[in-house]
Amino acid sequence: KRDGSPFLCLSDFIRPLSSGIPDTIGAFASSIDADMEGLYQQDPYKHLLVQTLSDRLAEAATEKMHEYVRKEAWGYAKDESLSMSDLLVEKYQGIRPAVGYPSLPDQSINFLLDELLDMKQIGITLTENGAMYPHASVCGLMFAHPASEYFSVGKIGEDQLEDYARRRGKRDRKSVV
């Protein structure tokens, strides 16, 4: 990077197996009822409102799930008491990057998460390219590391893409983006 800050990777926020110390990473998925997608098809304004509300509900479910993980399941923030404004600016420990966002842009990760989570149990199906249906669905990973932060992978070179595809066990580099 030009500003001298480090190049980050999500694996920076989880202990390597070679450390011999166990660590935890979480996987999540949330969605709204697929029937919401069909509401108000004849009224573009109301349909857009339903789509927007559906997206917000899926994100809110993820936020609530992350709070449960921080306070109870993993318990590293048992006494956390954040205001709504603190929640909105993510003043909590840990991150939950979603697939397709800047720190986890590879949409093919959805297939791995589907194998782990069996997302069809909550009504999520994947297209051949890994896009989720219903569209108001979100999945990703949870990290508790105190220094974890969101970042953007940014532009990568052909050599990096080929190396990534090889390490993912993919023959064609196009199958990982």
Task: Identify the role of each PLM range.
Residues 153-158:
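Short acidic alpha-helix initiation/capping motifs at coil-to-helix transition points
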